């Protein structure tokens, strides 16, 4: 049955009390995906190190019937996994809404943006006010382009503008309660894609993880639950240091203690003598494998003292590598222990993209073909002239007016700089590396795939292409001819440190589905032009709309015809896609004295 997303959009209201974190209910076309944005809390201006980035995100699901994960973080924490393919969970400074897409040829709809927090909106909104409904028959008029740039896009609207958003845009929303611990988080899923965002106002850092799963959702779910937790441990002493240990609660001493088998005996009482392992297996097992929102909440409750500015950038990259190695080892160990009951875990995996922003430093780690791009103004010696892109640029659906110079080159204001490295059989160096590592296997690359299975050459999980014992535990139809002991798929990431300068305007982080239809140059050009014309629009959702428009055009169908194709079947036309646009305009951190 088709999703009917383009025509059947039923109304829903935010009628239940809002806890400290609110899950966006699967209303409207929530199964299609969701958009979200980060809006700093009203109290942030009082902090000396307030976060100044604007974050716009969107996720699109092509798969609706994602199987229930064999590894389920929510169930491990005592919850029940929801049965829909797209969901989003946030703390207070994030707002989220189901995707509401429109055909770009008729003009974009701006249905995502910060929620005003100046009007004492720290609790649930009036349930009588419908915050969602059918798309308007005509798209709203675009905002005036007289004032341009990201600064308008991410400034806080007045309460009157919120009312206009309700009446004119019929926007569904979730307004969680305010949190005061300085840590804000969001995580969501769309098909087999997962996204995890953590903002630490006090520590002046931003963590973004985009995990593009394949052969099942178990690997990306495991990454959301565990990678940030491992990374935070590795960053101790680099990004932060523990405050006075005397202020720790008892359970924090227990969790942070050494993993030995010594008994804890409070002398004289005789009433509390349990081993640390036993405590972790009971009360603290939930902490160890809690859902990803607990990563933000548990660590946010700890007393952390700011560390000095980072000078050893290699130490940060090494911490990222160690955190990934620990997460991978834990996942493969879980897979090994589950082979008797759930051998399917051996084939599940994920491409990975992590961006860590601290002050004016960006650290990127990636496996697979997801990408991180920074849009830069040309330097003084660069005339901004780009050849060979005219034919593709005319497909960008936001009414571009491209200036040309003699010789047929297009002039653009911003250029893309890719911070990640693609790992696939399309990269000649990767193919040569695998063949060098497997000289006795002339079938290591078959049909442009590793062992005829995967297009990517580096990934998280996928144990059947890393360990012979995991491969041999599969049914014969899934088993590879595994020769030797060397992994066919590597978990060695590519790493990058980038120092932000006045040239850098925004970051675009995305899973590979975006680049099925757009090049790096087109992505930057689209976001730049869109935000100049519609400063209050949603650049991430606009990229999703552009992707769908191109997919429909390539398939020879109407935009809404594509949306009405049942999810699962629509996977033939586009992949699950997660996109994040992070503005770098304005001061990065209030305390850093750095302007971009």
From Swiss-Prot:
Keywords: Hydrolase, Magnesium, Manganese, Metal-binding, Protein phosphatase. Residues 122-154 are annotated as: Disordered. Binds 2 magnesium or manganese ions per subunit. CDD domains: PP2Cc. Mn(2+) 2 binds at residues 212, 512, 575. GO terms for molecular function: metal ion binding; protein serine/threonine phosphatase activity. It is an enzyme of class 3 (hydrolase). This is Probable protein phosphatase 2C 26. Signal peptide: none annotated. GO terms for biological process: signal transduction. The keyword Magnesium applies. Its cofactor is Mg(2+); Mn(2+). It holds the Pfam family PP2C.
